[in-house]
UniProtKB/Swiss-Prot annotation:
Substrate binds at Y112. The active site is at D54 (nucleophile). It comes from Oenococcus oeni (strain ATCC BAA-331 / PSU-1). The lineage of its organism: Bacteria, Bacillati, Bacillota, Bacilli, Lactobacillales. It is an enzyme of class 5 (isomerase). Formation of pseudouridine at positions 38, 39 and 40 in the anticodon stem and loop of transfer RNAs. Keywords: Isomerase, tRNA processing. The keyword ATP-binding does not apply. Homodimer. PANTHER family: PSEUDOURIDYLATE SYNTHASE, TRNA PSEUDOURIDINE SYNTHASE-LIKE 1. It catalyses: uridine(38/39/40) in tRNA = pseudouridine(38/39/40) in tRNA. One of its GO terms (biological process) is tRNA pseudouridine synthesis. This is tRNA pseudouridine synthase A. One of its GO terms (molecular function) is RNA binding. InterPro entries: PsdUridine_synth_cat_dom_sf, PsdUridine_synth_TruA, PsdUridine_synth_TruA_a/b_dom, PsdUridine_synth_TruA_C, TruA/RsuA/RluB/E/F_N.
């Protein structure tokens, strides 16, 4: 038996998320991967993902692992998977890892990107790959607000209703914004040990409202203190969110 760590990218638009839904007719990234790897192994294979991205969310660097019944070289796994996967999923890298490696539980940090299109009208070529926000924005206000997210906090106000995690305490280690005026785009980068369901999309929604002037610049501090999801209001669309990279202690 051999454990494989596989880095993949995918266009999330036509998927109902990464995780198997156990619902007739649903299409998920995990289902497509299981189908292909199980066919290669000639037996049902369990596929574990580092992040359970939501419907419409994309990935540049999702990591999965699976234990294969026999040892093949990395190129054979990569070529075998890419020759059978649908064209909206791509295997980028395959590595042999110890049997106890788990793509989800072995990770210690994740990086997500969020793309915002600020064009007056929705660009037909960006509509599935950015969140659209056409209201006026003062990006200096957003830049001033971003450091308020850094550190270990109770992010209850930034968790989707119905969140069932054992704790809402998370650590954000990076929160940055790059501006691309020629493309009418903003690019947010967030890194942390883990994120709550919809946390990044809610954080982006709050930051955009700060930039628009409908919230005070340091309203994030208040939201963290009051622990009230209803006060955070706007959730940015799934289309702008990308899982960019997953980090592992022994493989950085």
């Amino acid at each position: 038996m051999q454990n494989y760590k596989v880095t993949i990218s995918y266009d999330g638009h036509y998927f109902e998320g990464f995780q198997t839904q156990n619902r007739p007719g649903s299409r998920t990234v995990q289902d497509e991967l299981i189908k292909v790897v199980s066919k290669m192994a000639k037996t049902k294979i369990k596929v574990i993902g580092a992040s359970r991205t939501d419907a419409g969310v994309h990935a540049n660097g999702q990591v999965i692992n699976f234990i294969f019944p026999f040892d093949l070289n990395e190129k054979a796994i990569l070529m075998g998977m890419n020759s059978q996967l649908p064209t909206d999923i791509l295997v980028k890298k395959v590595e042999k890892v110890p049997i106890n490696f788990n793509a989800r539980h072995s990770s210690h940090r994740k990086r997500y990107l969020y793309r915002v299109s600020t064009s007056k009208f929705i660009d037909p070529f960006k509509r599935f790959y950015t969140g659209h926000y056409f209201w006026n924005l003062d990006t200096n206000k957003i830049q001033e607000a971003l450091p308020d997210l850094i550190g270990e906090h109770d992010f209850s106000s930034f968790a989707a209703s119905g969140n069932q995690t054992a704790t809402t305490i998370r650590t954000v280690t990076k929160a940055e914004l790059k501006i691309f005026p020629k493309n009418n785009e903003l690019l947010f980068t967030f890194e942390g040990n883990a994120f709550l369901y919809n946390q990044i999309r809610i954080m982006v929604g709050v930051l955009l409202e700060i930039g628009n002037g409908t919230r005070p610049v340091h309203d994030i501090i208040r939201l963290i203190k009051i622990k009230d999801r209803q006060q955070a209001r706007f959730t940015a669309p799934a289309s702008g969110l990308y899982l960019d990279e997953v980090y592992y202690e022994s493989m950085d």
